[in-house]
């Protein structure tokens, strides 16, 4: 009876061996879960969004008259928050700004602080709303006229300012200015004399109308037909023989000898007069280009007094 082992004791002896096996399986499951979580976290870290690239610099058009204006505008722009760098181009009246800010807001601040016209050249703002209808110019009975003026302009800024003033005149459609030649071409329905007065009132610059050459009159078709008939295209004469040609030449020579060459003499006289006129015009032009020196200062050299001169002992006497 004492040798038999109870089944309850056997179960109690096998229980401690089963517990460690379950713990090992749990540990393995936890380790696998950690590996999977680590593998999932790695691509998330790699896929983190990169910072956006800085915006490209934008270009503004501003009226720059001189170096003082440019420095004043540059200082006012650098005070705006977000501006990193400012580059001024006085030849083209352009300002390049680098920074994170709205170009239109910068334009408005420049207009408010400096009282100068400014607009965005690049990048252009997106169009809002529906596109504007095309402008239809009214048909005037007088029609368009082109007037060429001669105005003294010192620099490109003067030319731009003059163009802006002329475009505000009623009836002006297009204006082209060239400061190198002082030429201004205006197209529109305005009066030329009123345009000259307007330019002087607005800019205090003297303008002069350049006269245009008259167009060459076209020969009518009837005159061309008469010339053809006179040349003998319609009525062709029979060919002349050699003897007849010689006789005609002799007759022409005798007539020219009797008349004394009137037509040729008149032609040579006109050429001589033209040559004299051109020579006189050239001489007058050379006189204008000559430099006349100022008259020299004349010094009158008075002879020395002869009162106490050794050369003339009779100049003085003591009585």
UniProtKB/Swiss-Prot annotation:
S-farnesyl cysteine lipid attachment residues: 316
Modified residues (Cysteine methyl ester): 316
Biased composition (Acidic residues): 255-268
GO molecular function, one term: metal ion binding
Positions of the UniProt region annotated as Disordered: 1-57, 207-282
Domain named HMA: residues: 55-118, 144-208
Binding site for a metal cation 1: 66, 69
Keywords associated with the record: Coiled coil, Lipoprotein, Metal-binding, Methylation, Prenylation, Repeat
Pfam families: HMA
Alphabetized InterPro entries for the sequence: HIPP09-like, HMA_dom, HMA_dom_sf
Intrachain disulfide bonds: none
Keyword Lipoprotein part of the UniProt annotation: yes
Positions of a metal cation 2 binding: 155, 158
Pro-peptide positions on chain: 317-319
Coiled-coil region(s): 21-48
Top-level taxon of origin: Eukaryota
Chain intervals with Basic and acidic residues compositional bias: 1-11, 24-45, 224-254
Similarity comment: family membership: Belongs to the HIPP family.
Function: Heavy-metal-binding protein.
Protein name, per record: Heavy metal-associated isoprenylated plant protein 9
Species for this entry: Arabidopsis thaliana (Mouse-ear cress)
Protein encoded by which gene: HIPP09
